[in-house]
A protein has these predicted regions:
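His/Asp/Glu-enriched, well-ordered alpha-helical/loop segment
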Residues: 46-57, 64-89, 93-94, 99-103, ...
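Short conserved micro-motifs at the rims of enzyme active sites and ligand-binding pockets
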Residues: 14-16, 103, 235-237, 257-259
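Metal-coordinating catalytic core of metallo-dependent amide/deamination hydrolases
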Residues: 1-67, 79, 104-111, 116-117, ...
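Extracellular/periplasmic ectodomains of large secreted or surface enzymes and adhesion receptors
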Residues: 256-276
Length: 276
């Protein structure tokens, strides 16, 4: 068990008009959202965290919330005279970001801890909250974040979404919504970027890149064998991917095929040979 992070929450969710926005909601003109924990309170936590070398992970969904937390992180680091990048502070969700703030993630070394599946689940109704122009400019700008040097971590935000890494990976590369339309696909990740967001980037965000995140000698060898290659299969077939086997510390812990004995690597080797 490792305890090295502190979670705070500055705003609510966009669907409930709780995300803190720079401008009023398109469908609720008298509101810019909610502030659930004050900037002053979160800043106090951040100051203590710096002194003890802790990571701070702050929930921020709206563009105002993201700007305020970026400002807060930068301000605390300057006041404490520390280099913030090694602290690996994160913004959880980072869903709607003003274009002026996008490059600040990479510049400051703030990790965007996002959930790919949120974009496609929320996509059909986001324009009702933000309007088309603001949605296109601010919502889930993964391509812009990556191209300005940000590290993106990925997940599902369970229980808000099912704990299905394949579904979130598919959303990350396709931006395909359940209505059959794509949500501003120009902001999609490449397949390699999406895979990194779920592996090496998440390991980095958890200070575990020396033991997790890649299949490298000396690491834990925690990995899964999938029914098809996520990097080459037709995009529409990605959701049909099954987990064939799960290995923990190099040992077989789960197999969809009951005939595979624990520790039997022959099938794994044949899959690897086929893919190469």
């Amino acid at each position: 068990l490792t305890v090295r992070s502190i979670k705070r929450q500055v705003d609510g969710a966009l669907g409930a008009h709780g995300a803190w926005l720079l401008e009023p909601y398109e469908d609720m003109q008298d509101s810019t959202g909610l502030v659930l924990e004050t900037i002053e309170d979160i800043e106090g936590t951040a100051e203590v965290a710096v002194k003890h070398g802790f990571q701070v992970n702050t929930h921020a969904i709206g563009d105002r919330a993201n700007r305020e937390i970026l400002d807060l992180y930068e301000r605390v680091w300057e006041e404490q005279a520390v280099d913030g990048e090694p602290l690996r502070w994160r913004i959880e969700h980072a869903q709607h970001i003003d274009p002026l703030d996008v490059p600040r993630f990479g510049e400051l070394g703030v990790i965007a801890a996002m959930q790919g599946v949120h974009a496609t689940s929320d996509g059909p109704w986001i324009p009702r909250r933000l309007g088309e122009a603001r949605t296109e400019a601010t919502s889930y700008p993964w391509r812009d974040l990556i191209e300005t040097g940000a590290i993106i971590g990925n997940g599902t935000d369970v229980p808000v979404e099912p704990i299905d890494a394949i579904a979130s990976y598919y959303s990350s590369v396709s931006r395909m919504m359940n209505n059959g339309e794509k949500f501003y696909p120009e902001q999609s990740m490449t397949r390699e970027e999406a895979l990194a967001s779920y592996t090496v980037n998440n390991a980095y965000a958890a200070f575990e890149e020396e033991v997790k995140g890649t299949l490298t000698p000396g690491k834990y060898a925690d990995f899964v064998v999938l029914s098809q290659n996520l990097l080459t299969v037709e995009e529409a077939e990605i959701p049909n991917t099954d987990v064939e086997m799960t290995f923990v510390a190099g040992e077989l812990k789960y197999s969809r095929d009951d005939s595979v004995a624990a520790g039997d690597l022959k099938r794994l080797a044949s899959v690897a040979d086929h893919d190469h």
